[in-house]
């Protein structure tokens, strides 16, 4: 194949970067965002292209991804140099929102656009809350980035993929785990498969 050497190099670089916790070195507007810069740019491109009025994110951690989504949606509301706020929203779901992270997100200038739900993203009551919120929006995008086990991601896909609008996206993060050696993350419940 034409790009097989590049693919091998990319996979090798990604593993070496993860060995060094490279993804923990970045912030978005002051909040840590546990992502590779290339993924951040790709998300920005998807949001700008689709122009959603609701982004649903599973997994909050430090809140950097929520802030990225909210800031991009704020930019979508600038029309001809004037800020014309729409009813855009970012909903973040996490089973454990650490208090110091919650406080930091709540005092961030982008918080006005963010709702956080504490609970498992696959819990029926959480799913129902999100379905209700989604019913009030016309263009929905979904980012799945919480528990990376096969069963959990499959359950999230069943719950949230049907909410994705036509011509929008459901993005599953960290599928790179499939390219790493078995038990690469010994302190995590996910692995290859």
Where are these regions (language model features)?
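Mobile, glycine- and charge-enriched loop segments
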Residues: 1-41
């Amino acid at each position: 194949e034409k790009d097989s050497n590049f693919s091998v190099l990319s996979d090798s670089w990604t593993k070496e970067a993860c060995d060094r916790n490279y993804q923990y070195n970045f912030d978005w507007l002051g909040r840590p965002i546990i992502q590779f810069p290339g993924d951040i740019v790709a998300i920005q491109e998807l949001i700008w292209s689709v122009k959603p009025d609701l982004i649903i994110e599973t997994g909050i951690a430090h809140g950097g991804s929520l802030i990225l989504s909210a800031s991009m949606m704020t930019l979508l509301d600038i029309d001809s140099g004037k800020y014309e706020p729409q009813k855009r929203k970012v909903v973040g779901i996490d089973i454990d929102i650490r208090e110091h992270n919650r406080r930091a997100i709540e005092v961030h200038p982008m918080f006005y656009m963010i709702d956080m739900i504490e609970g498992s993203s696959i819990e029926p009551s959480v799913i129902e809350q999100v379905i209700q919120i989604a019913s009030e929006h016309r263009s929905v995008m979904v980012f799945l980035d919480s528990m990376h086990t096969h069963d959990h991601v499959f359950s999230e896909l069943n719950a949230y993929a049907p909410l994705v609008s036509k011509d929008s996206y459901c993005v599953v993060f960290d599928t790179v785990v499939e390219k790493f050696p078995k038990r690469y993350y010994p302190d995590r419940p996910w692995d290859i498969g």
